Each structure stands twice: as C-alpha cells, then as structure tokens.
Design a protein with these regions (language model features):
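Short alpha-helical segments enriched in small residues
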Residues: 2-177
C-alpha cells in the first residue's frame, strides 16, 4: 500500500455495530473466500482485535501477526508513524490511525490493515479529546478509511466497542472492494 494513497474520514458511523465475535467471523470468512490476509496495529485495544480474529477457526489462513503499539515511541519505531504527526495531532487522531494502518500493512505485507487508537479511560480525556474517543482505520488496496467514534461506558466497554468497530470496518472495506 503506497503512502500517497487517498485517506478520508467517513462522515457517518455505522448505524449498528455487531458484536466482535460476529464481526470477526464475517471478516475471517470473507478473507478466506477471497484468499487475502489481515494485519493489525492496536493501541487502546491492546490486542483485542487480534484475539477476536484468532478466536475464529481458520484464522491461521488469513492472519499472520499484529502489533500492539501502546506508546508513541512504539508507534514510531514499529509502524513508522511520523514523530511530527504524533506531536501535531497526538496519538489519538485520524492522522495517526491512518499512519498506523500504512505502517502495519508495510511491515506485514498483508492485504488488509486494521488500526485502532483512542482513549479508553478512565483518565486522560480532555474537552477536545474526551474518554471514549477512538479512531479506527482500515487500509485496503489503494485507500485508507478512518472512522471516528465516541464510545461510552467504562474502560473495558470502550475497548470492547472499539474492537467490534475495527472488525466491522475491516469487513466493510472488503465488501466495498
């Protein structure tokens, strides 16, 4: 995936986000049907997206690895997220989510890249970037989709919702091909 590809933010979130289990099954089965692979880069979800994928029978045919890049330094070192992007936009931004997708796709040479960054709380939120703000990106072929979400609940609820949203966005990206 070239870094010069189109990146945009979807204007409307999904009306309904299915469960992580259901979305993972849909994603793994579609990837298997079209003989493609997925890689992940996760921050606030801490591996939950990868765990949901590998919980599906047959995942080994479509999933090679994932990155957990919780701190900025890991995002930069492992995924190539620009220090300037991190400084200007912060780790919780559409720009960083897009660069995470580019970076993990390049590192793992997968067809589909899913990335998640956000604030799961309970601390760390601001008026501009409240707890529950999550950016999910999906890189497929020549484009990266970035979706902004505002989830509610405790830390685990926010992480679970972000996981389900990432898997659903990945599935949506494949269906839109």
């Amino acid at each position: 995936m070239k870094k010069t590809t189109l990146c945009w933010r979807m204007l409307e979130p999904f009306e309904e986000i299915l469960s992580a289990k259901e979305n993972a099954q849909n994603l793994v089965h579609m990837l298997a049907d079209i003989d493609q692979t997925v890689i992940t880069a996760e921050s606030c979800t801490g591996g939950l997206v990868s765990a949901a994928i590998v919980s599906v029978a047959g995942a080994s045919a479509v999933f090679g690895n994932g990155f957990i890049t919780y701190c900025d330094e890991a995002k930069h070192r492992l995924l190539g997220v620009s220090e300037e992007t991190l400084d200007v936009y912060t780790a919780v931004s559409a720009e960083v989510a897009a660069e995470m997708a580019y970076g993990c796709a390049a590192a793992g040479q997968a067809d589909l890249a899913l990335a998640v960054t956000g604030l799961a709380g309970p601390d760390g939120g601001t008026e501009e970037k409240p707890v529950g703000l999550v950016y999910v990106s999906s890189g497929y072929r020549d484009r990266v989709l970035v979706q902004e979400y505002h989830f509610s609940g405790d830390r685990e609820a926010i992480r679970a919702q972000a996981t389900a949203a990432a898997l659903q966005l990945g599935y949506f990206s494949l269906r839109a091909r």
